Amino acid sequence: MAEAGGGNASAPQKAPDKVVSGRVTDTAGAPLVGVNILIQGTATGVVSGSDGGFSIRMPEGRDNLIFSHIGYVSQTLPSAQTRLVRLVQDEQEIENVVVTGIFTRKKESYTGSATTITSGQLARVSNRNVFESLKNIEPSLYIMDNTLMGSDPNTLPDMQLRGITTFPSESTGVSIKGNYQNRPNQPLFILDGFETTAEKVMDMDMTRIESITILKDAAAKALYGSKAANGVIVIETKRLAGNQELVTYTGSIEVSMPDLTSYNLCNAWEKLEAERIEGVYTSANPQTQVDLTKRYNALKAQVLGGLDTYWLAKPLRTGVGHKHTLSVELGDSRKLRAMIDFSYNNVAGVMKGSERTVLSGDVNVSYRKKSFLFRNILSVSNTRSDNSPWGDFGDYARMNPYWSAVDPQTGQIARWAYDEVANPMYDATLGTLDRETYTSVTDNFYAEWQATEALKLTARLGIAVKRSDADEFYPAKHSKFATSAYESTSMQLRKGSYQLDNGKSSDISGEIYANYAKNWGRHYLYVNAGGRIAENTYSAYQHYAEGFPNSQTADITFARQYAQDKKPVGISSITREISFLGTASYSYDDRYNVDLTFRESASSLYGADNRWSSAWSAGVAWNLHNEPFLRDQDVLKQFKIRASAGLTGNQNYDTNEVLATYLYYTGATYHGQTGAYLSKMPNPALKWEQRMDYNVGADITIHRATIAFDYYNSVTENMLTDVAIPTSTGFDTVKDNLGKVRNRGIEAKLSYTLWQGKQGFFNLFGSIAYNKNIIINLSESLKAYNEKMMAQAQDKSNSTPVLIYQDGMPMNAIWAVPSLGIDPTTGQEIYVRKDGTLTYEYDAQDQVVAGISDPKYRGNFGFAAEYKGFGLSATCTFLGGGQRYNTTLVNKVENVDIHYNVDRRVLYGRWQTPGQNAMFKKLGSYTDENGKQHDEKTRATTRFVQDNNELTFSSLSLYYEFNPRLISKIRLKRLKLAFYMNNIATLSSIRIERGTTYPFARSMSFQLTGTF
């Protein structure tokens, strides 16, 4: 008998852990690498390997596995069902990741400030172009209305992210059409991991876009080092996802209607009355008075007879454009997949003959072999921009309504509207040509090797080539040549002009990165290291010719000669760069997160003494919602606090600023030899412009409400500035690094889901961005620039504020002389001197900062709803806190030439008699009763600086997506109908003409999408 407790006693044995193995793929059957597989209720897990396979030991009592991967819907499955796991990509999941263009990170562990916009969000706002959608979604990206060019489809918008960062660059003296390079405040654009241009983004087919990520603070954008100071916009196109052969067609018709609500011009009777009041038909000379009375009576009879030409409508139309996209998806989904896209987009502007036509094709091929992935995207596009032959819209706004647009005898468009006043409509009948075209070919190759479960190597090679041409032809009969300067016989032969521009550019870049990602227990480590090398070349040439007697000879080879005193000119540049990048991210228990980035870059853009520059960032984040004391509750779903600091650079500048560039003397020789001279003073010590960013923020989700908040403080230093130097050097200025500018701001977003169900949702949203810009350290070297601006302001012919820079003031400050209004006794304006005394004499030295042209805050609000396939969304945008100088009141009321049409406010509010309280003084240019000519133009005064607050109903969309079961009977997988309206209405606190060269437009479009 064995003793109690003896070694032969039978004890319960622990059951051995079972091993669960399986494979994870996407819906197309392609293996997913790096999927996190976690045993539910524990911190134990593994990561799927290069073929999507995994193997994990399951302890006793545990049976469920959680599968999660960036951009895919997480799944929890019992171990018995994990032999083959398919993860589904979800648009909502895309919002929870950050695509940087170099790697993709979970938003929960990301420390940077970034906004991700999905294709669905873009489509709910507009189907016109990317910038139209971004303008209505993200207020921190300020896409400015162009008050001159309005809704011209061929004008690229200006934009800035989190304020102005640099002084505007002075012109090189050669203005090449179609050259949109070196806009100093423009963000960097990344398309599928490669740099691209804003013009390319504007012409993109929006149906190709999967997501857009805007990188704002240093922790987010320091990846791009010396190019990231202005922010980075990362665009990802749609990846191949299906395992079937699919054909998708999207077609739309867009209707654009002119918006002339900002114009307040006189009709025929009002204009005639304004002329009478201003004394146009009054003279002290009796004989002259008789002639003036006859003229007035004749015009009055015509007006009473019904002559009232609405000139604004003459060059306009309701533009009808159309867009078509065909996408074909084919191939073996497990190894070789391909997607081919064809797109045609015709944008018809509201001015007759104004169009932008884009024809593009893309081939996306993906091949996977075991642990290797190869992807190549070839894009070819051709864009043709036709500017309206009807000329400048402002010319029509000047025409008197009592002038006839057509010859009353023949009914044809008259060459002269009145006496020697040219009819702008006539120019459109002559064969005028103003066209730009460009063709671009881009090939982006991507290779990936999943060496181990944790180590991945990636490589990119991108090649882009662009060729652009521009033709501008004006026949001899054009109104440009209907002046006394062309009356002589020799000048007659010079009538007609042609400007021909040719440009080409090429970009080649290569990148290689290694990244290591490892999960162990509660720890997660991600390390990425690599480098980039790139070269960009650009050249453009411009030719002027004249002498085209025949309007049908719209070709420069028919010119009589080169334009007088002109010769072919051009610009060229070449930029080379190399950089090395290292990033590291660490996360503990999904609670504490740290991101570190360092990039060392060298560029030929800057001086030989300062080729290299460093960019860095450090970011931390704390996920409070994952703390034990907040984990077991359902109300607070997310509460992340983050902070970052870092340094980035800007190089949106002319490449020849630091090079010793020489030009040849073409007009003389010395002993048969041609001499050369230095065209500009080089500066080998020129440094990188740098921006130091500090950012704190929070991301909070409480029940159905999502809140995001950011506060930032950015200081830009080493700003490139034209510095005055002694003329004994042979130059007036040289580029140098001087001055600092600070931008401080707050951004806040709120989204609230009122209702969410299986059949739909109803969501409210709103956001606001506030920015304050100020110059904090301005060098004395800019004193010469300010003196030049002050001299311009003192010029009696100048009526608009000039740009003056001063410490403690915003960069876009509006400078004007203080005004107390119009003296009721004399009708003259009363100015306030710097010493506080009053005067009638204008002195530009008395100017003060009267306002800021940039709005202090911008934002949007609206809703998005869907129910049983029906969707409705609306967005309003607003801005305020800034000021504008009302040029309409100056140019169309006070400084107006009364012989052309004027603003209706000329009829009232103008001082006429002593004792009258008036808003406006008497006419600036006039002839008194004694026949003496007066020209007392209104200058820049605070009287015309007005608060600028706007509310715009910017977007409305309605769509219906058919039930898949219903349309499957006709072999359709998807069918969607949509209707859009954009720029519907604008309410403004300031009455000013908008779109003075090209009018603004309201648009609506109808879209159909079908997948077979």
Question: What residue ranges belong to the model's regions?
Answer:
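Short, acidic, small-residue-rich periplasmic hinge/interaction motif at the N-terminus
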Residues: 2-40, 64-73, 80-123, 131
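Conserved small-residue
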Residues: 248-302, 542, 736, 753-853
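Outer-membrane beta-barrel transmembrane strand signature
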Residues: 190, 297-343, 410-450, 564-583, ...
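Residues embedded in well-ordered regular secondary structure
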Residues: 125, 137-160, 167-183, 187, ...
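Acidic/polar loop-and-plug regions of large Gram-negative outer-membrane beta-barrel proteins
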Residues: 303, 386-442, 476, 480-499, ...
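Extracellular/periplasmic, surface-exposed regions of secreted and cell-surface proteins
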Residues: 358, 364-382, 420-474, 490-800, ...
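Periplasmic N-terminal accessory/gating domains of Gram-negative outer-membrane beta-barrel systems
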Residues: 6-11, 73, 110-179, 189-222, ...
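Extracytoplasmic gating/loop element in the C-terminal half of outer-membrane beta-barrel translocons
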Residues: 480-482, 562, 603, 879-976, ...
